[in-house]
């Protein structure tokens, strides 16, 4: 666990780092020639891409810690549990690198989120991946199916499509990006179609075998 929650560690920050790397690769392979820039023998080092992504995440973690210190906010690394009610509020025990007992009158519980597996599709992080596993893939998969057209799924679909995967996105709703403006969703789908993502709407996922 690290500062920043899902977005910083296993969400939009690392996915956008990989988006940038994959975009550079795609530009070098398919678009630089249009500008008179000829490149031969363009290769990809996925391990370096992943390492750069991890560096970007670490820089964000460090930046958050700096802001906490700058604003005199104490940070304790560990797992917290309410112990009892005491005069002045509640006692919280923190178990971690150093055990601490804290007391607060007002306490905000912000535990973050975990990926939710669908019935019949448990994560094994080998064949069925959560967002965390999808950000750590060591080789470019030949084929990749993404369940749901959420933000992270679409970003990771773009990444792996640019790097050579055949990507299919299964969306249970009958419309693409149903929660956003209809015209924006229409233009976004055009862009993803142009990238080569295959988007199937109204598909429900059963058991994966």
Whereabouts are the PLM-identified features?
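Glycine-rich flavin
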Residues: 1-140, 168, 173-177, 183-184, ...
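Rossmann-like NAD(P)H-binding beta-loop-alpha module
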Residues: 138-175, 179-180
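Alpha-helical macromolecular-interaction surfaces
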Residues: 155, 162, 186-187, 194
